[in-house]
């Protein structure tokens, strides 16, 4: 192993602590490793859940960030598909066993040995992982994706989590021409889901609590928009959709949403509410309907998503901030005061 790489980071010392600038050591390059100078790091709501230890098991000090865009500055001796100067990205995971049925099927997120997360995780050597609120990161080459030239790096960073989180279920449930899909929520995830579903050729309906975001949703590619605060919405849309993609973290009236599915329709959730949802099993039985979830996507699919986004002009709406604004950004996210993703300019760190 070569010498370690010192890097400045933004870290929290304990749950709900303020961010501090400090220094850590990244591991030296192994044969299949890539050293990346990070240019931008997106802020995901998962970062807040983790930094506040709302899901438990937090590893502190913690360096969040799994929406990483940067440039390769060094490669290991056995790296053949990446070179110094390449524009690259790193998402939610940085390693997996590479041998189980799911890894071999390009679904590393379901690795039976346990996928290594980009931060708040432990690698196979027993060391804690630190994420993208950092100047540099060292990653196994097979977990690095290329950022297409048509995507600016700041815009690309949220796609590494928010983008693949919405693209993957739409693809898995065969959203495309002739399909009617509803997107629940017009936020960090929802505004990308609308664009992906539209580009895939589906008829897209947006479901949001109020009519406040109608104009934005239609501009993003929605064909229809309804407010779920109006009970008449559920009557008007009964039995309409092949797929409903729920992108919000609030608890829903699941039975009401299931009623809007066609026979064999599926309600897919990528938002994670703090409390369990409840529903009647008859809402499933009577229409042979399904409830499902989706966990980001594999590395091959993430690359496919980036290429698809570049080809179809799909971009997240972002607000670029400095390293000294992250605490404020967290507060603004919690009060829904962002359109729609914050991205940290790492040059300010």
Swiss-Prot record:
Its EC number is 1.1.1.-. It comes from Bacillus subtilis (strain 168). It comes from the Bacteria. Keywords: Metal-binding, Oxidoreductase, Stress response, Zinc. Pfam families: ADH_N, ADH_zinc_N. Functions in the protection against aldehyde-stress. Induction: By formaldehyde and methylgloxal, under the control of AdhR. Encoded in an operon with yraA. Binds 2 Zn(2+) ions per subunit. Zn(2+) 2 binds at residues 97, 100, 103, 111. This is Probable formaldehyde dehydrogenase AdhA. Transmembrane segments: none annotated. Its cofactor is Zn(2+). Disruption phenotype: Cells lacking this gene show significantly reduced growth in the presence of formaldehyde but not methylglyoxal. Belongs to the zinc-containing alcohol dehydrogenase family. GO terms for molecular function: oxidoreductase activity, acting on the CH-OH group of donors, NAD or NADP as acceptor; zinc ion binding. CDD domains: CAD1. Zn(2+) 1 binds at residues 44, 66, 161. InterPro entries: ADH-like_C (IPR013149), ADH-like_N (IPR013154), ADH_Zn_CS (IPR002328), CAD-like (IPR047109), GroES-like_sf (IPR011032), NAD(P)-bd_dom_sf (IPR036291), PKS_ER (IPR020843).
